Amino acid sequence: MEPFVTMGLVLKETRYREADRILTILTPKLGVITAMAANSLRLKSKLFSACGLFCYSEFTLVPGRNMYTVREAEVQNIFHGVSSSIEGVSLAMYLTELAAALSPTGEEAARELRLVLNSLYMISEHRTDLRVIKAVFELRTMSECGFMPQIVCCRDCSTYDEGDAFYLDAQEGHLLCASCAAKAGKSCNLDKAALFALRHICLVEDKKIFAFKISVGSLAKLSAVAENYALTHLDKPLKSYAFLKSVLP
């Protein structure tokens, strides 16, 4: 079959044999794909840098029976700043594993790819709290993949933002005001600022998802809810999660 060119982000690399790598790549038109990068672990290989973890590269791929083969690869962005801290690396590993688990296979994933790239850029720039980046990615990814919570108003009384506390049900994805949460025997897990941020993350256009401010206290609530919501809807645990929590509790 004829080779073709695509942009792609390396979400995972697995050593195979002496110097080969099997790559999990997120692409804009084919979603998540698997590709063999032969001899890419050799320092003199032209594929060495472009096939590394978190590398955004231009790949020339040859279709195969079970996976693609990387014929050529040229680096576009390596996100150098990600590796400058253990917290940044652990978060990047978590986000890319989450993206690999939730992004489609064999169909368009341009928005998912853009979100991962933007998140890695934010990590590498060291200007935004890592907990904000994590919460934004979790909530936006779930929303993009069809798991957006029903956050416009209280499920039971339809109030929009009356009161100072709210409850988001991670399993069912619905919102309750403080009064309705009490009637249902639930303890509120969001304050008004955290709810505002949650709505912002899920509903605004892509280029504005990080454009909000939040206090430390409200961020703690948002972070807990975002993480619980994302992990509740995954089919299996993420291997990177325990490591992330050990360095970024």
Model-derived features: positions:
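Non-catalytic alpha-helical scaffolds and adjoining flexible linkers that form interface surfaces
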Residues: 1-249
